[in-house]
Amino acid sequence: MTHLLYCLLIAASTFSKAEVFKAISGKDASSLTKMISKLEDLSSSSDQQAYLGTLKMKRAEQLKTAKEKLAMFKEGRALLEKSITSSPKNSEYRFLRLMIQENVPKVLKYNTNIKEDAKLVSSGYQSLASDVRNAVVSYAKQSPNLSL
C-alpha cells in the first residue's frame, strides 16, 4: 500500500517535457491551456515553475487584450526567472528562456540574455535529458543564435 501511494505521488509530481515542447512549438491555444492546467496541478519544483512560466509566456501571445497579454507574460517571466536565479547554470532553463527571448516582441524588452543563454545551452547540451536534447536540436535549426 505504501509503495502504491509513493508511485502515485511520484506520478502526480512529474510531467512530460516532450509534451510541453510540443505545446510550445504548436499554434494550438487549447494544448497550451491544458499543459498550463496540468503543471499548475503539480507540486511546485524548479522544473515545474520554469516550464509553467514558459508556457504562460507563450500563451500570452494568444490572448485578446494587451492588458491580458502583459499580465500573463509577466507572471510567466517571474516563474522562469525565479528558476534561473535558483540554478543559474541550468542549461535547460536557459534554453526555455532563449526560446522565449528570441520570439517575443522587442517592445517587451525581454531579450538581454540571448547570446549568454545560447552559449550556455550549446556548452551544456550533452548533459541534457534526451527529450530536452531533441527539442534543442529541433529549435537550433531555426534559431539565429543557437548552434550546436
Regions found by a protein language model. Name each.
Residues 1-19:
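Bacterial Sec-dependent N-terminal signal peptides
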Residues 23-36, 69-77, 110-111:
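Helix-turn-helix repeat elements of alpha-solenoid scaffolds
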Residues 25, 58-67, 103-108:
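Short coil/turn linking the two alpha-helices of tandem helical-hairpin repeats
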Residues 40-41, 84-85, 123:
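Conserved structural position within tetratricopeptide repeats
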Residues 43-44, 88, 126:
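Short coil turns that delineate tetratricopeptide repeat
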Residues 114-148:
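Terminal, low-structured helical/coil segments at or just beyond the last alpha-helical repeat
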